[in-house]
Amino acid sequence: MTHMFEGVGVALATPFTNNEVDFDALERHVQFLLDNNIQAIIVNGTTAESPTLTDEEKEKVLATVVKLVNHNVPVIAGTGTNNTYKSIQASIRAKEIGADAVMLITPYYNKTNQRGLIQHFETIANEVKLPVILYNVPSRTNMTIEPETVEILSHNPYIVALKDATNDFEYFDEVKQRINANEFALYSGNDDNVVKFYQRGGNGVISVIANVIPQEFQYLYDNRQNETDITNYFKPIEKLLEALSLDVNPIPIKVLTAYLGYGHYEVRLPLVPLEEAQCKQVERAFEQFKAGEQ
């Protein structure tokens, strides 16, 4: 079995202009990513500000991306919620629109136990019959998919991958020991750990920063066998990532998507923009990176 993708998937930011989704900017941004050879596009996830998108907006964003991508790379829709049956409905609709897979976050707020997680994910997968990427991000959900749970879920034919945003390599190593690496992919959900993630056998990344430096991030994957090369190549990227850590994602990355002309610098409440001085700091870090300064 081949994996859903190998290399860089981009967690797509949603451009806004006057608090409305800017579909012209969205199309230009997606074309930029395709022109730079990214391997997958993930829509309606955390970086997309999905909690503040309406169902209609999510569907229209997905339809726009699916049409533009035209089967050249997988389009993966974030459809997971803390309500199993709403997740099923959203996933079925994504399938109808043309998504190649869905990404399901662990239930948040109401949470559950590991037995509940298994039933939650398998109920969705078996009903929707579309490839599923599990999304483990305990920093946002206060809920972890334990390694033994990943192992159980990996036997479901529709559950094909894990996006691991734990930044915990003991967790990663245990998961990797428990799964069939030929059939189940492991993607990093943390841009700052990709070098180490690749060195330990990860299959790729679902990246935020690749919204603006897709080619550079794909280079890291393409040259992952050369540890010295990618370690050195990554050093200036680390400096840019430091600037993007000024606030919660996607607040800082949208400074740069706007800087590149993909919509205005807008986020929806409860998110608020960076202060002007912080915006300048992020832009300056990006300019220095592009100029090759370290």
From Swiss-Prot:
The family database entries (InterPro entries) matched by this protein are listed as: Aldolase_TIM (IPR013785), DapA (IPR005263), DapA-like (IPR002220), Schiff_base-form_aldolases_AS (IPR020625)
Question: Which residues carry the site feature described as Part of a proton relay during catalysis?
Answer: 46, 109
Q: Which Gene3D superfamilies match?
A: Aldolase class I (3.20.20.70)
The active site of this protein is located at 135 (proton donor/acceptor), 163 (schiff-base intermediate with substrate)
As its record notes, the protein acts as a catalyst of: L-aspartate 4-semialdehyde + pyruvate = (2S,4S)-4-hydroxy-2,3,4,5-tetrahydrodipicolinate + H2O + H(+)
Task: Report the CDD domains cross-referenced here.
Answer: DHDPS
The record lists pyruvate as bound by 47, 206
The GO biological-process annotations, alphabetized, read as:
diaminopimelate biosynthetic process; lysine biosynthetic process via diaminopimelate
Pathway assigned in UniProt: Amino-acid biosynthesis; L-lysine biosynthesis via DAP pathway; (S)-tetrahydrodipicolinate from L-aspartate: step 3/4
Q: Name one GO cellular component term.
A: cytosol
One GO molecular-function entry: 4-hydroxy-tetrahydrodipicolinate synthase activity
Which PROSITE patterns did the record assign? DHDPS_2
* Compartments, record wording: Cytoplasm
Q: What enzyme class is recorded for this protein?
A: lyase
UniProtKB keywords: Amino-acid biosynthesis, Cytoplasm, Diaminopimelate biosynthesis, Lyase, Lysine biosynthesis, Schiff base
* EC number(s) per entry: 4.3.3.7
Role: Catalyzes the condensation of (S)-aspartate-beta-semialdehyde [(S)-ASA] and pyruvate to 4-hydroxy-tetrahydrodipicolinate (HTPA).
Family membership: Belongs to the DapA family.
Subunit: Homodimer.
Q: What is this protein called?
A: 4-hydroxy-tetrahydrodipicolinate synthase
